[in-house]
């Protein structure tokens, strides 16, 4: 892309035939200079002189091995207080945060410098592609010097603002199309919300929170939608979410049956984002649908009364723990729930699981949590009719069979029943229907 044509010999160019030429006559040719560079790339032109197809053609010129079209582009053009031109592209991004091979390229006066733009471009935007051209970026200096340079700070701030403005305009001009692209661009936006406070503020107007049913809300829309049903007795808004629509299906359906909205939050940095939102917004908390039973996740003034006495609950708890055995890692909780709810439910405490996820995805959480085993609670619904049957069963064989069946169904619902235990459950289930 150097600003002067670079000639590499000559090439033969075929010209159109004259109108009076015969069909068998060969087409005329001429020798022309073989120019091997593009001295007027798209970023040197005015945005008004370019069409959408011109931007796509330039993307293919930059990244010939990329076969997917970019989702959209941002044309950068400023001459005060610094000089900078360029085009940034939002590619389709996968869920992992691994560094991509094709990155933003840095030029000075159309001369290629590097594709390592850390310190110049905000970290969350290094996942984008494209070109930045600026004579005001100092070269051959340390990264710490680069990050402290006043011009570079202004350039970084300008790029962040332009990206935020572009996303905001896309959202306002064609929300339906923006929603369709959300899953392909959310990782950049969420990363930006975590790492740049100014971007976090701007993104509040266009960052989306999809539900498991495919509806999309901004945060303010979401608050308005759920405030009546999902505000607990302490006046805190509890936002329920799932990370695996299929794996957590039974928990999702139980929440929907109570009229609750369940968000779909499955990006690798979602635990960090939720913590940021909980600390920056007032009186909100996030809870995954399988973190506890619903009456505990969203506690209301009225509470369920247990059909079992304290003595019966202690007896039942002992019977369940006896079947689980000493090596069991489950913490048994006796809870008065709706009689139509599951007899047994396996839950994963929100705080411990989230700390572990944050540690595994890098940064945050508690040191060493990433290697800790998963923690599960076994919630026993004391109001389910089966609990009375277990307590009143005359033979220990039937009681153990009922407890095992309830336990395995709970583990199956949570995706924890595997291998030999799954095979045993299948055989036992066949025996029951013979």
Predicted regions and their residues:
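Conserved GHKL (Bergerat-fold) ATPase module
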Residues: 1-434
């Amino acid at each position: 892309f150097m600003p002067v044509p670079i000639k590499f010999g000559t090439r033969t160019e075929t010209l159109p035939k004259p109108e009076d030429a015969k069909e068998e006559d060969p087409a005329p040719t001429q020798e022309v200079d073989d120019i091997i560079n593009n001295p007027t790339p798209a970023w040197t032109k005015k945005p008004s002189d370019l069409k959408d197809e011109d931007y796509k053609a330039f993307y293919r010129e930059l990244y010939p091995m990329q076969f997917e079209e970019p989702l959209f582009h941002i044309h950068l053009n400023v001459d005060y207080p610094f000089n900078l031109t360029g085009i940034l592209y939002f590619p389709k991004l996968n869920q992992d945060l691994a560094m991509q091979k094709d990155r933003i390229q840095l030029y000075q006066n159309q001369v290629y410098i590097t594709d390592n733009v850390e310190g110049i471009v905000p970290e969350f935007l290094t996942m984008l592609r494209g070109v930045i051209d600026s004579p005001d970026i100092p070269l051959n200096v340390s990264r710490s010097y680069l990050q402290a340079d006043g011009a570079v700070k202004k350039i970084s701030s300008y790029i962040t603002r332009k990206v935020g403005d572009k996303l905001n305009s896309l959202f306002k001009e064609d929300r339906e199309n923006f929603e369709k692209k959300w899953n392909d661009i959310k990782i950049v936006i969420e990363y930006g919300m975590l790492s740049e406070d100014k971007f976090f503020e701007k993104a509040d107007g266009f960052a989306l929170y999809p539900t498991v049913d495919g509806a999309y809300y901004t945060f303010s829309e979401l608050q308005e939608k759920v405030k009546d049903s999902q505000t607990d007795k302490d006046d805190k808004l509890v936002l329920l979410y799932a990370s695996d629509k299929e794996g957590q299906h039974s928990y999702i359906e139980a929440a929907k049956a109570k009229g609750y909205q369940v968000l779909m939050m499955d990006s690798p940095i979602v635990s960090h984002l939720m913590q940021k939102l909980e600390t920056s917004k007032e009186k909100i908390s996030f809870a995954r649908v399988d973190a506890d039973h619903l009456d505990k996740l969203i506690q209301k003034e009225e509470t369920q009364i247990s059909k079992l006495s304290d003595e019966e609950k202690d007896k039942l708890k002992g019977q369940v723990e006896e079947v689980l055995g000493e090596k069991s890692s489950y913490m048994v909780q006796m809870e008065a729930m709706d009689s139509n709810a599951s007899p047994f439910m396996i839950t994963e405490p929100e705080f411990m699981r989230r700390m572990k996820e944050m540690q595994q995805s890098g940064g945050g959480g508690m040191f060493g949590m990433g290697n800790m085993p998963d923690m599960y609670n076994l919630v026993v619904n004391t109001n389910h009719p089966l609990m009375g049957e277990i307590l009143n069963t005359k033979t220990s064989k039937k009681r153990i069979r009922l407890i095992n069946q309830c336990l395995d169904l709970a583990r199956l619902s949570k995706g924890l029943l595997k291998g030999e235990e799954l095979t045993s459950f299948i055989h036992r289930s066949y025996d029951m229907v013979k």
